[in-house]
């Protein structure tokens, strides 16, 4: 009865909320959000530098998140490179001196705070000069120093960081006359600061709050009320300058949350001072170094030649899409299946496809690529950095697994690793990887090591699936190869052109493509051994095992010959495909990390198909895979193996050391046995996970730009100020886009890859010319 009610309820929901309706809702949300953010940028503050300097919040201990953009954590080498041949002056009181020390420690962490309290402090590092000038009050002495810089009689700094107020409050006991004099003195230097701002960067540091409870008697008059009055005076006076002196307010906001940790109530704890220093460094250097994880103070990058050509093609496609109209969209496609929400497969031959179909598909793909560009290249949407907490990873993990169990259904097949089960496997792994990426869980080594197993499991499935196909069907035709390569690479090739990223940037697709080529070569080259050939002959089975052993030795040889490996892949045109930032090292690292996973998948497929052929497995519904004794034994060993691996991974302290062990330690086989030995487990699958499994490749690639941001370094912000709602909305749009791209890829594959040899060879020749042209243009770029 409960099952009937569940099925009726599911049918009722799908009648009103089909996949098509979900996509229409997602498209409407994209349009509204784009208009909202574009209008906010146009009519409001569109400068991310203003956001960086003015506001933010703590994500966790000492992790500062500016409003709407990402803060890059500068290393010493980066800071030195950015500030080479620059003169920087910190002007003010003891609080500015603290900021000065935090700033120069980013250039040289070994610096000690040993300068005299009320004197100037010089700092020279190579050809960079950073000086602290002691001016505790805004007075004539300060005005004279600023005048020297404007008149050119003293070397003018490239950057001036200035601020003072607490001494004025202290010396005049917080009297109102002192505030009036402070305003007058600020007015007197406002024009001078304006002139300096014409050729230098000038920052006025707003006063941080104090912790009144622990202030000494001599500082009791420095209250937060007084601090606020002096800050208001500074803003109202200096805001009138045409060049608009920049206000550093972010450190003040950070101090509001941490001032209670102050020892004397006046000076900030070092971690809070570091926030102000890092904000300043981002403001000065992001536009120079353009770090991908530092989106503050960066404008949209200029279009490359390839991007301009891609934009022209996509624009023509969009025009065709609009002209054809939505009414003619896939007339031959039947209505969606109410039960599953998926469109039913049309039985018509490929040759009967409506010629408008490919144009409509390309038009939709063009609009989707426009959304990708707006999300992660144009200066429209906000971005925030990741911050790992255990709850951010494990709570969503528990939630999706509860959903997965809730949507358990009887599988149509009960064979080991049947299609529904492999889709389920890919689905839950992909969801875990998505949560892993958005939560920044790579910072937690035990989670990182478990996710490494999931990536290896994808490659294991690659070996298992393609070996099984070639072994059973013996189809080594060009059509099959082109179909696989097109489905794997179509989205990535388009993204490389639109997002101006190298092929290796989307590392998983090059990895899977490479291993598919290896599997194909292993199975297709002489001696070509197939199941029908090996039937009844142990010799051919042994020959295939020797072939796999040869592949294993080949892999081992390259794994221990890094120079040879890098030498081969550094030759053009392979270098253009596998290099990242001019180096082949990333490809070497990715390849080496899971080098045995594909061979393990091939070997497992061979052994399984052999056992199946000789009827040594019980794959009936509800039956254990082996006899009860063997099944229980294998289950026990598998569970112990799983637990042992988890304990080992939890004890990992160093990523590089654990990565060295990773290729030799695998629990993939243990998982397969646990999932398949019990008959009841093999008879069920999660339709929830299986649905995501069918679009797992698209989900993995699309996350780079429309769910995460800054090429996976940050998080896309569609709904500012509400992280939970933002994740819900961006995830909904992201999944709908991935599903649509999957359908577009499948549709275009039928048209782009004809079965006839003649047309197929012509298109391959065209694809080759296109590839050479793209590689040549990218080299010139």
Curated annotation (Swiss-Prot):
Q: Which residues form the active site?
A: 94 (acyl-ester intermediate), 264, 267
Where in or outside the cell is it found?
Golgi apparatus membrane
Q: Which UniProt keywords apply?
A: Acyltransferase, Glycoprotein, Golgi apparatus, Membrane, Transferase, Transmembrane, Transmembrane helix
Q: Which GO terms describe its biological process?
A: carbohydrate metabolic process
Instruction: Report residues carrying sugar chains.
Output: 139, 185, 239, 654
Residues exposed to the Cytoplasmic side = 1-15, 330-354, 408-430, 474-477, 526-537, 617-629, 682-687, 736-756
Reaction equation(s) it catalyzes: CMP-N-acetyl-beta-neuraminate + acetyl-CoA = CMP-N-acetyl-9-O-acetyl-beta-neuraminate + CoA; a ganglioside GD3 (d18:1(4E)) + acetyl-CoA = a ganglioside Ac-O-7-GD3(d18:1(4E)) + CoA; CMP-N-acetyl-beta-neuraminate + acetyl-CoA = CMP-N-acetyl-7-O-acetyl-beta-neuraminate + CoA
Q: Does the keyword Flavoprotein apply?
A: no
The reply to whether Transmembrane figures as a keyword in the UniProt entry is yes
Single GO molecular-function term?
A: N-acetylneuraminate 9-O-acetyltransferase activity
**Stretches in topological domain Lumenal:** 37-308, 376-386, 452, 499-504, 559-595, 651-660, 709-714, 778-781
What's a GO cellular component annotated to this UniProt protein?
Golgi membrane
- Give the EC number(s) under which this enzyme is classified: 2.3.1.45
**Residues covered by region (Disordered):** 330-350
Q: Which domain of life is it from?
A: Eukaryota
What Pfam family is a match, any one? NXPE4_C
Q: How does it sit in the membrane?
A: Multi-pass membrane protein
**Which stretches are transmembrane?**
16-36, 309-329, 355-375, 387-407, 431-451, 453-473, 478-498, 505-525, 538-558, 596-616, 630-650, 661-681, 688-708, 715-735, 757-777
Q: Where is it mainly found? A: Golgi
Entry function: Key enzyme in the biosynthesis of O-acetylated (O-Ac) sialoglycans such as gangliosides O-AcGD3 and O-AcGD2, which affect various processes such as cell-cell interactions, host-pathogen recognition. Catalyzes the transfer of an acetyl group from a donor, the acetyl-coenzyme-A molecule (acetyl-CoA), to the C7/8/9 OH-position of a sialic acid residue.
Which family, according to UniProt?
Answer: Belongs to the PC-esterase family. CASD1 subfamily.
Q: Which PANTHER family match?
A: N-ACETYLNEURAMINATE 9-O-ACETYLTRANSFERASE
Its recorded name reads N-acetylneuraminate (7)9-O-acetyltransferase
Source organism per UniProt: Danio rerio (Zebrafish)
The top of its lineage is: Eukaryota, Metazoa, Chordata, Craniata, Vertebrata
